[in-house]
């Protein structure tokens, strides 16, 4: 069990580095904390359209329903990891831009501490930001200008959850979240006529 926890910790560390390098290339990520990602951590939950609160099974980690951890066998160790791929096309009446991005998506693990107490932990991206836009304008005072807006980075979210079985068919659970990361924005103004 100790080897499994060590392996999962190492994978989580490398996963955090992969999150920081994710590049979404979406103009929608300009606003707020960026483009908020799907909260469903498990691929089975995403495949069902994000239905997660009702899912309650011992063979998967459902971070959106922490009481579901109580269904995990007390001798089991669950490890789940995923990858993310997205292909997008952005177009206007005369321009089109394609972008494809792949990144490490999430890592989570769950295990039983006692027959009535189960624990889960994991990390996943909360939001991503990646855009580069240029705006050309002409002003009578200075002439032609080009403004470049660029943003990169995002926020990650780690969680630690516990579930307690308090009856044959009743369980309660709660998660604690920690959100961290950075978003870098840059605005550059060029004066092409001033050369």
Model-derived segments and spans:
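Subset of outer-membrane beta-barrel
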Residues: 21-195
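Sec/Tat signal peptide C-region and signal peptidase I cleavage site
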Residues: 14-20
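Sec-dependent N-terminal signal peptides
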Residues: 4-14
């Amino acid at each position: 069990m100790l080897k499994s926890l060590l392996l999962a910790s190492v994978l989580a560390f490398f996963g955090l580095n992969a999150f920081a390098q994710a590049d979404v290339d979406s103009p929608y990520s300009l606003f707020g904390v960026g483009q908020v990602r799907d909260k469903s951590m498990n691929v089975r939950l995403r495949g069902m359209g994000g239905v997660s609160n009702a899912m309650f099974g011992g063979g998967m980690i459902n971070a959106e329903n922490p009481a579901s951890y109580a269904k995990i066998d007390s001798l089991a160790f669950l490890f789940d990891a995923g990858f993310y791929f997205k292909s997008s096309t952005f177009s206007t009446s005369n321009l089109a831009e394609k972008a494809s991005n792949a990144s490490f998506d999430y890592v989570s693990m769950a295990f039983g501490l006692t027959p009535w107490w189960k624990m889960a932990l994991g990390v996943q991206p909360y939001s991503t930001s990646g855009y580069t836009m240029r705006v050309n304008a002409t002003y009578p005072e200075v002439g032609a200008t080009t403004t470049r807006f660029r943003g990169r980075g995002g926020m990650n979210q780690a969680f630690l959850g516990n579930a307690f079985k308090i009856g044959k068919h009743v369980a309660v659970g709660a998660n604690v979240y920690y959100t961290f990361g950075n978003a870098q924005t840059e605005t550059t103004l060029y004066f092409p006529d001033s050369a």
